[in-house]
From Swiss-Prot:
SUPFAM superfamilies, alphabetized: Metalloproteases ('zincins'), catalytic domain
Cofactor requirements of the protein: Zn(2+)
Record GO cellular component, one term: cytoplasm
Gene Ontology terms for molecular function: metalloendopeptidase activity; RNA endonuclease activity; zinc ion binding
Name this protein carries in UniProt: Endoribonuclease YbeY
Binding residue positions for Zn(2+): 112, 116, 122
The keyword Nuclease belongs to this UniProt entry's keyword annotation: yes
Organism of origin: Geobacter metallireducens (strain ATCC 53774 / DSM 7210 / GS-15)
Catalytic class of the enzyme: hydrolase
Gene coding for it: ybeY
Amino acid sequence: MKVAIANRQRRHPIGTPRLRKVAERILSALGYPDSELSVVITGDLGIRRVNREYLHKDRPTNVISFAMAEGEFGALNPAMLGDVIISADTAAREAEEGGVSFWSRLCFLLLHGILHITGYDHERSGEAEARRMEAKEREIFAILEREGLV
């Protein structure tokens, strides 16, 4: 399992080895032990650029995922799942609004992004799929909490 993490912001301290462990545990729980994943932590400005360029939405968001399997050459390397981009700025705001720690929110957004990459969808596939994704989020987040990763 290979998880590459790039922290491209400095405002919010993030332990990348610790975040890598969380990503590896999520992938293991989902049955992807031999996969590869790229995670980028950025600020609102960086994620806004990505959101505008690729999704045509000119605003920051919390997490954006790009699944390699959805691309034109997805079958070339099936082990490469894709990229998860998280805004630490938005995560920090959401953590404060939700009364949870920044770390907890960051890990939840990582989980949410990985679920999208592995085929879960809450936006385009209807209520049943949204409930299935939310149930999987609760299940795996509980594992992370039990194991002291969150």
